Amino acid sequence: CPAIQRCCQQLRNIQPPCRCCQ
């Protein structure tokens, strides 16, 4: 997902790796 940062911000996932968009 190219918009991983936005996805993480919405889900508030600060800890990498962030797999919010999978």
From Swiss-Prot:
UniProt keyword annotation of Protein transport present: no
| Keyword list, A-Z | Antimicrobial, Chitin-binding, Fungicide
**Any GO molecular function:** chitin binding
Q: How is it modified after translation?
A: Glycosylated; contains 2.5% carbohydrates.
Query: Which BP terms in the Gene Ontology apply to this protein?
Result: defense response to fungus; killing of cells of another organism
What additional remark is attached to this entry?
On the 2D-gel the determined pI of this protein is: 10.8, its MW is: 14.34 kDa.
Purpose: Chitin-binding protein. Has antifungal activity against F.solani, F.oxysporum, C.musae and C.gloesporoides but not against P.oligandrum. Depending on concentration the antifungal activity can be fungistatic or fungicidal. Inhibits both spore germination and mycelial growth in F.solani at a concentration of 0.1 mg/ml. Has antifungal activity against C.krusei, C.albicans, C.tropicalis and C.parapsilosis. Has no chitinase, beta-glucanase or hemagglutinating activity. Acts as a flocculent.
The protein's name is Chitin-binding protein 3
Organism field:
Moringa oleifera (Horseradish tree)
